Amino acid sequence: MTTDNSAPTASPWWSLPGKFLRREFLPVLTDLRLAIALLLIIALFSISGTVIEQGQSPAFYQANYPEHPALFGFLTWKVIQVVGLDHVYRTWWFLSLLVLFGTSLTACTFTRQLPALKTAQRWKYYEEPRQFQKLALSAELDAGSVNSLSQILQNRRYKIFQEKDDILYARKGIVGRIGPIIVHIGIVTILLGSIWGAMTGFIAQEMVPSGETFQVKNIIDAGPLAAGQFPQDWSVRVNRFWIDYTPKGGIDQFYSDMSVLDNQGKEVDHKKIFVNQPLRYHGVTFYQTDWGISGVRVRLNKSPIFQLPMALLNTNGQGRIWGTWIPTKPDLSEGVSLLAKDLQGMVLIYDAQGKLVDTVRAGMSTQVNGVTLKVLDVVGSTGLQIKADPGIPIVYTGFGILMLGVVMSYFSHSQIWALQKGDRLYVGGKTNRAQVAFEQEVLEILERLSSQSATASNQQS
């Protein structure tokens, strides 16, 4: 007598994590409800990043989001900076949401979409009439032939598979099964582009006077891998900045004439920019976003022309005014203040007691404290927002793939089987979408088949 002592072999310990991932984690990761929840959360924080100004100074948030009263009862500058809502698209938790969403889509593609495509490509002939009973749409005809049906289906762009004269399988719209996979690829590409842009892009701001040359230095927000995007071997010169005003004195548009210079100071690009018409060079985009007054050019008596810097004054929200002070005596014991609110050339002159002495325009002179003061020009400065986002081409590519996948998904994957048994013709079909349209198409095919059979019978008789 022999005894069977065989027992189930225990799985090695290193295979346990893989089994756990497949049985417990993977079903959760591929759950449609998780993908929808992640998409809604990402959309919510994306909206917050649009509503809440990004990349501003702490003073800006303290002024616009005070603790008392808090916006919506909870949104203060402290909350914004602690959570990272001032640079939401670069926070670790937002990037983690993108990675998790992309991982969910990728897992869904491999565990559901690709198997569904493989299943759609695997088919078999129906060789028994009872097989047609499980189809949602089927018919039994006492006239017609498989060959006649084959010709009708070919005219309707079906791909025909036929090994015997009495058996047929036809399909069209297999591209509709590929469409969801392409959609997932497009979305994942968009997510990768967004992550790459957040990691390698930067935002800078510069206020540059007319005639000045600058390099991008004032970085206000940058990804951890953005150092390689900072311009090193070229600079930008603001040739001229000016503002067009409406007849009523309001600002119509402001312009900057800009040149890109290489290391030798040679102009390699040139463009006049204004709002919504930026300058782009080597992946860096310069937007016209603001303006200011950087200085005023004056002359006292017959002295050389000199330029005084003008500073933005605190007006408690009553508009923007720039001012400077100019001495009228060598020992600096007396002087006057010059104020300007725009680039139309109007300058207000105040004495030490704050009394308005005179109002002059650019090119005019006036007598103050016994000297002749001539205002030659008010020098403007252009406010530029500078961005670099290497992920944008990837995002655009992803959107192109996404739109292609959406179009492909509109095609219905329709399948038709046919079997000739004696004088009986069995026809059945199914589709994955647009069921009503498919039923109408099958009815038209059967009517066409019946009319051909009737015509053939009349000709024989």
From Swiss-Prot:
It comes from the Bacteria. It is a multi-pass membrane protein. May interact with CcsA. GO terms for biological process: cytochrome complex assembly. HAMAP family: CytC_Ccs1 (MF_01392). The chain crosses the membrane at residues 32-52, 91-111, 178-198. Required during biogenesis of c-type cytochromes (cytochrome c6 and cytochrome f) at the step of heme attachment. Belongs to the Ccs1/CcsB family. The keyword Thylakoid applies. This is Cytochrome c biogenesis protein CcsB. It is found in: Cellular thylakoid membrane. InterPro entries: Cyt_c_bgen_Ccs1/CcsB/ResB, ResB-like_domain. The keyword Cytoplasm does not apply. The gene is ccsB. GO terms for cellular component: plasma membrane-derived thylakoid membrane. It comes from Trichormus variabilis (strain ATCC 29413 / PCC 7937) (Anabaena variabilis). Keywords: Cytochrome c-type biogenesis, Membrane, Thylakoid, Transmembrane, Transmembrane helix.
